[in-house]
Amino acid sequence: MVHLRRTTSPYWWPIPRKAGGVWAVRPSPGPHSLAYSIPLALVIRDVLRYAKTLREARMIISRGYIKVDGVVRRNYKFPVGLMDVVEIVPTGEIYRVVPDERSYYALVPITSEEADLKLLRVEGKTAVKGGRLQVHFHDGRNLIMPAETARQIKTFDSVLYDLKARTVRSHIPMRLGVYAVVTHGGNVGFHGQLSEIVWTLKRRQSVVLLKRGEEAKRTILDYIMAVGAEAPVIKISP
């Protein structure tokens, strides 16, 4: 695997660039890309500050004390990204990774009732055998659904997924009036009602306008996620 220098790591990682050594932990291949993920070791050491050194963070992780989306992760390089649920098993603390205007991504504490819930954005669909469709989500997850159900779910829509039951609880279409949050780009973390979509030949580059009170922000369709019909269905901000 190619090494990763601190100076070339994603700018929002909470690590010093010119101190602490030359190299940073490079996320292993997984559900999120390098640009939009942070290694589990840095979550434990630099974000939550449960460890002072990488050695301590690796020890905590290797002992099975950390769950991501309800699964024990022992790989300290595991990539943690948007909407992932991080649980500290010994303390019972649970956090969700959400877009944040100050730190790009932030971990916000959530209740145990929300721990099994995760918002997933639809990235595409593929036809499979048996007349069914496979729906692809932003975190690398794939679900095979009956064609009638999957046809109602469009690219850019969101679903509220039950991690424990492994089922879709609800469907949130990407349409005017929906409540959405900016997940990437210069306006990351801003959330509000989707009031305008200017469609372009490249759908992902379509310009959208989000409004919250008197404040409004423009970005592209590829940079937003629907999080509720009129209000967020889960906690999305600190």
UniProtKB/Swiss-Prot annotation:
Belongs to the eukaryotic ribosomal protein eS4 family. GO terms for molecular function: rRNA binding; structural constituent of ribosome. It comes from the Archaea. Residues 38-109 form the S4 RNA-binding domain. Pfam families: Ribosomal_S4e, RS4NT, S4. GO terms for cellular component: cytosolic small ribosomal subunit. NCBIfam families: PRK04313.1. SMART domains: S4. GO terms for biological process: translation. The keyword RNA-binding applies. The lineage of its organism: Archaea, Thermoproteota, Thermoprotei, Thermoproteales, Thermoproteaceae. Keywords: Ribonucleoprotein, Ribosomal protein, RNA-binding, rRNA-binding. HAMAP family: Ribosomal_eS4 (MF_00485). This is Small ribosomal subunit protein eS4.
